[in-house]
Amino acid sequence: MSLADKIFVDMCNDILDNGTSTEGELVRPHWEDGSSAYTIKKFGVVNRYDLSKEFPAITLRKTAIKTCTEEMLWIWQRKSNNIHDLKSTVWDEWADENGSIGKAYGYQLGVKHQYKEGMMDQVDRVIYDLKHNPFSRRILTNIYVHADLHEMNLYPCAYSMTFNVTQKKGDDKLTLNAVLNQRSQDVLTANNWNVCQYAVLMHMLAQVCDMRVGELVHVIADAHIYDRHVDLVRELIQREQHPAPKLWINPEIKNFYDFTVDDLKLEDYVTGPQIKNIPVAV
């Protein structure tokens, strides 16, 4: 069975059984009807996914791999902050009349900085170091820029990726690992979505840097289940689990900026039914 399913189920059970409630507290999120959106939360959740063993898409319900990858490429490849560059409507709630989400997400990755090697943005710096200085302990991105928070329509949830390269004994190729730091996560709507996005990113970067994929470590400061999601989560984690799917990525792509959503697919992906009409707190 899928290791990602086990990780997800264990996390949800831990939150439901051992988490703390925000009910009655002053909280920012609210439901469409204006009422406060309370959560059951756990602090400091850490999940480890060995991408060399399986692709971490849960099978309890389907994760739309092309849609979540398109969003990741919107941020990491196009470095865009405009929803008109994205087919999905997920971000519409935070866009202004021009489609901008402000100086958030892709905008920050596209800002060029002066380095000894020249002007580069954060993504290009990561790729440069993975190719030229792979054992550096300084290969990371950070989009939680305090100076620009007042110009962001929403603060970044997943805000930092730290890459770390290892050499396995007897292997002629290096292994790419990463830590994804996330300040907050709506577990039902976003957990596996984010995990799959950054797993795909690691596969893409490993391919263009001639490395193997290793571990993705997901650190969530506030992992929460909303009050109106509790029954949905309880039903979801009781479902039948299936073997993990296999990720296919076009082996011909050698430049990160050449990838499109048509260059990947999940094979043998058997899942439970989708959960429809999930209420979303904003």
Question: Predicted regions span which residues?
Answer:
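Terminal, non-catalytic protein-protein interaction segments that mediate quaternary/complex assembly
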Residues: 1-282
